């Protein structure tokens, strides 16, 4: 019974950590969304946007947590990142799954399906939102590998702790090779795990 209590406490902690990370990202996005949209409507320059994204990303890394890779925007057809990144030849933001999900949801808040970030080669989700004009957006990338590291530290007894998305795909926990796989495909049965 003591083992069950400890495992339940660890699962509570894991669930709360994930929820806190995502709700913090939503709060960060909300504050910056209105600021950046105002900057755009007021005619700020691209250099001012770059400086703003860099300043906000530095704040996140220094004051908040490294779970956030940065704040970015897609402003007037230009991808604005807080650090330099050479886009690969043929790169089109419109082809990226995270952009398509945000575009589909319009001004509604979007937490994207996990994807491999091309700049950092890390598994992330984006928390983002389109501007009222329907073509510009702002987002915050959340590093899922840090959540995985946190889950690895928790004692799950003889089991393992994973975070799965709505499709049943693993987005955090376990080995990096597990990312994107479904529990069903790993265990070849549906009763091998419990959801929490």
Indicate residue ranges for each PLM-predicted region.
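A short, polar/proline- and glycine-enriched secondary-structure boundary/capping micro-motif
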Residues: 91-95, 148-152, 181-185
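Membrane-proximal, non-catalytic sensory/regulatory domains of signal-transducing membrane proteins
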Residues: 100-131, 158-162, 183-196
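GAF sensory domains
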Residues: 81-90, 170-188
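Conserved beta-strands of PAS-like sensory domains
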Residues: 114, 120-155, 164-166, 171-176
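Extracytoplasmic/periplasmic sensory segments of membrane signal-transduction proteins
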Residues: 5-108
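Cytoplasmic juxtamembrane "membrane-exit" helices immediately C-terminal to transmembrane segments
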Residues: 1-2
């Amino acid at each position: 019974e003591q083992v069950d209590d400890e495992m339940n406490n660890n699962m509570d902690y894991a669930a709360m950590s994930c929820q806190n990370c995502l709700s913090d990202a939503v709060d960060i996005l909300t504050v910056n969304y209105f600021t950046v949209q105002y900057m755009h409507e007021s005619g700020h320059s691209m250099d001012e946007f770059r400086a703003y994204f860099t300043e906000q990303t530095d704040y996140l890394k220094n004051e908040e947590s490294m779970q956030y890779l940065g704040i970015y925007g897609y402003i007037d057809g230009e991808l604005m990142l807080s650090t330099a990144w050479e886009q690969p030849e043929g790169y089109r933001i419109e082809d990226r799954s995270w952009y398509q999900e945000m575009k589909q949801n319009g001004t509604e808040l979007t937490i994207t399906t996990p994807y491999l970030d091309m700049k950092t080669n890390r598994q992330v989700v984006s928390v983002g939102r389109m501007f009222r004009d329907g073509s510009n957006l702002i987002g915050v990338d959340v590093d899922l590998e840090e959540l995985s590291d946190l889950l690895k530290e928790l004692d799950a007894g003889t089991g393992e702790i994973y975070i799965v998305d709505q499709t049943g795909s693993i987005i955090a926990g376990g080995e990096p090779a597990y990312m994107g796989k479904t529990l069903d495909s790993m265990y070849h049965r549906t009763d091998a795990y419990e959801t929490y």
